[in-house]
Design a protein with these regions (language model features):
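Bacterial N-terminal signal peptides that target proteins for export
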Residues: 1-8
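C-terminal motif of bacterial Sec signal peptides marking the signal peptidase cleavage site
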Residues: 16-19
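Secondary-structure edge/capping motif, primarily at the C-terminal ends of alpha-helices
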Residues: 53-67, 98-104, 127-138, 174, ...
Length: 286
């Protein structure tokens, strides 16, 4: 998922540029300057959050650590590893949401980000300690750290999902304001919703040691419903190129859903299936 956020941003930006270049005007009420400024800040915070969450917890790295800790017998020696780097400015931004969110939402965001940062730090610290126990051949203590890291990996996944869920309604409201005059408003919003749902599915599937099948199935049902609604949106005259990209996106979402269903039939995580799903997701938003 290294480039997926950039691809998604490029797709939406293309739609936005096209919508500003002409076409029919909606008759939506004119938003106030304050509403537009708040909506802009919400989208900025959302985009920053996407970048932080992508860099903060790389699911394949987390699973690689767990894979190493799960090995029995003699294992190849490793040195201590550092967690993935995160831009300090962006971390500070997500920990200090502005008053474009209400007080309760700000508290929830700070609480979940603080929990995520703490869980990640403990996860990698535990791995470093695990390596030191291996050198001392203290298998019992090493095993205890594996159990702890199983829990921390799940916590990180939950915190990420919580942030997505908290931001989703605010992002949708902000889009309603900023895209009020865009003839491609509904298409842009449907792309964002489906992309967010696909991210959630990947996040849930990546839980190597504890696949949450029922939640994945619910998200797949949600994505299928979103796709069905997106297919019913009428074509926008004068924006043939953008509509072609939109239809391509919908086709790739269909492929993604089929790939998830195939992976779910196996009932367990595999790196190959995770790569397959990630590839299908990235292809959908190129």
């Amino acid at each position: 998922m290294k480039k997926n956020l950039l691809f998604f941003g490029a797709l939406v930006s293309a739609f936005l540029l096209a919508s500003c270049s002409g076409g029919s005007k909606s008759k939506a009420p004119v938003a106030s300057t304050a509403d537009i400024e708040n909506a802009t800040e919400v989208i900025k915070y959302y985009n920053t959050s996407l970048g932080v969450l992508k860099d903060m917890v790389k699911e394949k790295d987390v699973n690689a650590v767990l894979d190493y800790m799960e090995q029995k017998g003699k294992v190849p020696a490793l040195t201590a590893i550092a967690p993935p780097a995160v831009v300090a400015k962006d971390s500070a931004t997500v920990m200090n949401p502005g008053d474009y969110f209400n007080r309760e939402t700000r508290q929830n965001l700070v609480q979940n980000y603080a929990g995520l940062f703490k869980a990640r730090a403990e996860f990698y610290a535990n791995f470093d300690t695990y390596l030191s126990y291996l050198k001392k051949k203290d298998v019992t203590k090493a095993k205890q750290l594996l159990d702890a890291n199983y829990q921390l990996s799940t916590q990180m996944s939950e915190y990420k999902q919580n942030v997505f869920d908290i931001l989703s309604p605010f992002t949708e409201q902000a889009e309603q304001v900023l895209l009020a005059d865009s003839p491609l408003k509904e298409q842009i919003m449907s792309v964002r919703k489906m992309s967010a749902t696909m991210q959630s599915i990947l996040n849930l599937y990546a839980r190597k040691h504890m696949m949450d099948g029922p939640r994945i199935d619910l998200k797949v049902a949600e994505l299928t419903k979103q796709l069905d609604a997106a297919k019913k949106l009428p074509a926008v005259n004068g924006h043939e190129s953008e509509m072609k990209s939109y239809q391509t996106f919908l086709s790739q979402v269909e492929i993604f859903i089929k790939q998830v269903q195939k992976a779910r039939e196996k009932g367990e995580y595999s790196d190959a299936d995770y790569d397959m799903l990630t590839s299908a997701y990235e292809t959908s938003i190129i």
